UniProtKB/Swiss-Prot annotation:
Record bears the keyword Chloroplast: yes
Name by which UniProt lists this protein: Large ribosomal subunit protein uL5c
GO CC annotation: chloroplast; ribonucleoprotein complex; ribosome
Chief location bin: plastid
One GO MF term: structural constituent of ribosome
Gene: rpl5
Family, similarity comment: Belongs to the universal ribosomal protein uL5 family.
Coiled coil residues, start to end: none
Amino acid sequence: MAQRLKTFYLNSVVPKLRQQFHHRNIHEVPSIKKIVINRGLGDASQNAKLLDGSLQELTTIAGQRGVITRSKQAIAAFKIRQDMPVGISVTLRGERMYAFLDRLINLALPRIRDFQGMSTKSFDGQGNYSLGLNEQLMFPEINYDAIDQMRGMDISIITSATEDREGFALLQALGMPFRTATID
């Protein structure tokens, strides 16, 4: 079964963007390639219980098991040895990607306290968008009583757009709530 956001993208967003940017071929229209959710563990890397809890939370939020990222080299100042767990990463593609983006836009972001909209300055120059979240409680899948510590996450939305203007138009057409109607 196709996701609601994917169906909306194919039926409404593609024709709109094709007309807006004068694309001759439908394959020129920007699309979302993948979404990467990353969480740095910080002091939780010392404690296996916190690592497992964080991995379980990210798995619940993303709907897919995450990969534990490990340090490449030892850094004495941070008390990190080589191959020590330092973060968790989940890469979403296909149906799960659209399901997560739909939940992010329609459920999680509106639950942020004093939410004013997303910044347009987080584009990387190639149409990809990154955002950071301070806490995991905005996702309805997370039980407030089950969490041990507030931890944020970084979310990167990688698109096939070649410039920020196209990436902004794609995300705005999909319903991403931005502060301003134009890109800076």
